[in-house]
Amino acid sequence: MDMLNENASLLTLTYHGSRQVIEGYNVMGVAKAALEASVRYLAENLGKDDMRVNAISAGPIKTLSAKGIKDFGSILTVVEEKAPLHQNVTTTQVGDVASFLLSNMSSCVTGQTIYADNGFSIMGI
């Protein structure tokens, strides 16, 4: 990959709907699951060139695309109630995780999906 610098770090965003059914998320869940698989395969393929590939699975955040998800406000409420830290994640928090993954501090991390969701993803029903 000639257009990437040596020691490059590639990063993408995904969502919990890739692993569990989220009502109304539908085909996006399938797309995000494929994206996460691509992260793992790219990490293996690019590792020989000392390039890292990771994903951040952020909790629900109020974005333009979130407006297309039916009852998005109720999803935010459920996360706030059930997540161990009892709050929704902010764009700043996700940015902080991204900064870590793009920095040399994470030089041994590749092929991973890092959950930045205040612990919501560890909770059962």
Where are these regions (language model features)?
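Catalytic loop of short-chain dehydrogenase/reductase
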Residues: 6-34, 39-48, 60-61
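Short C-terminal tail/terminal secondary-structure segment
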Residues: 99, 110-125
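A conserved structural motif in NAD(P)-dependent oxidoreductases
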Residues: 83-94, 105
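Active-site pre-Tyr helix/loop in NAD(P)-dependent dehydrogenases
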Residues: 15-19, 85, 119
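Short, small/polar-rich loop/turn modules that mediate ligand/substrate recognition or access, typified
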Residues: 47, 52, 109-111
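Short-chain dehydrogenase/reductase
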Residues: 1, 39-40, 95-98, 102
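A glycine/serine/threonine-rich, flexible loop-to-helix segment
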Residues: 48, 58-83, 123-125
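Conserved SDR Rossmann-fold cofactor-binding beta-strand/turn motif
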Residues: 52-62, 102, 115-117
